[in-house]
A protein has these predicted regions:
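Single conserved hydrophobic/aromatic residue that forms the stacking wall/gate
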Residues: 1-8, 12-13
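A residue-level structural signature of the nucleotidyltransferase/glycosyltransferase Rossmann-like core
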Residues: 4, 36, 56-58, 77, ...
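A general structural signal for well-ordered alpha-helical segments in protein cores
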Residues: 13-16, 31, 44, 60, ...
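Conserved beta-loop-beta/alpha segment of the NTase-like Rossmann-fold superfamily
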Residues: 14-72, 89
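Residues that scaffold the ATP/ADP-binding catalytic core of kinase and kinase-like folds
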Residues: 27, 69-70, 79, 102, ...
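Conserved alpha/beta core of the MobA/IspD/sugar-nucleotide pyrophosphorylase nucleotidyltransferase superfamily
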Residues: 85-156
């Protein structure tokens, strides 16, 4: 049951912490990016089932593309095995105690390279974060092209 929602700011990690401070009396916390309007009830159910088993879960999909890691000079440094590469979506779901511990730990550190809440949990607690399948339609709308894709989803 959702107790309350908060409007975001410029830095999502600070927003997550603000949300954690508002919902102290809960067992699990679901952190969702408002730029992903196509999250489904089925995705939520899979994520909640996984977090109950593991304590930390991110939604995502196996990458359909080959991914290259680059060096600082713009050359390919490494090509990870595609079978091990997932593109991560939201929601990200955690036990309240775990995500709160992670955020409390990082508060006084440089957060400029933090990309999501799972990264905070990984770095600050060492906890494993499980993967749960999302949907290729659970896209993040950040560019005009994304909006075109979203409109196409709505037409079908």
């Amino acid at each position: 049951e959702m107790q309350r929602s908060l409007v975001g700011s410029e830095m999502c990690i600070r927003d997550s912490y603000a949300g954690l401070c508002e919902c102290r009396d809960c067992e699990y916390v679901l952190i969702h990016d408002g730029a992903r309007p196509f999250v489904t009830e089925e995705i939520l159910k899979r994520g909640l089932q996984k977090v109950k088993e593991t304590g930390a879960c991110v939604i995502g999909m196996p990458s359909k593309d080959t991914v290259k890691l680059s060096d600082e000079e713009g050359y390919v440094k490494e090509t990870p095995n595609r079978k091990c590469v997932w593109t991560i979506q939201t929601p990200q779901i955690f036990s309240y105690s775990l995500i709160r511990e992670a955020h409390d730990s990082i508060r006084q550190k440089d957060m400029s390279k933090i990309t999501d809440d799972a990264m905070v949990v990984e770095q600050e607690t060492g906890a494993k974060v499980a993967l749960a399948e999302g949907s290729y339609q659970n896209i993040k709308i950040t560019t005009p092209e994304d909006l075109d894709i979203a409109e196409a989803f709505l037409k079908h």
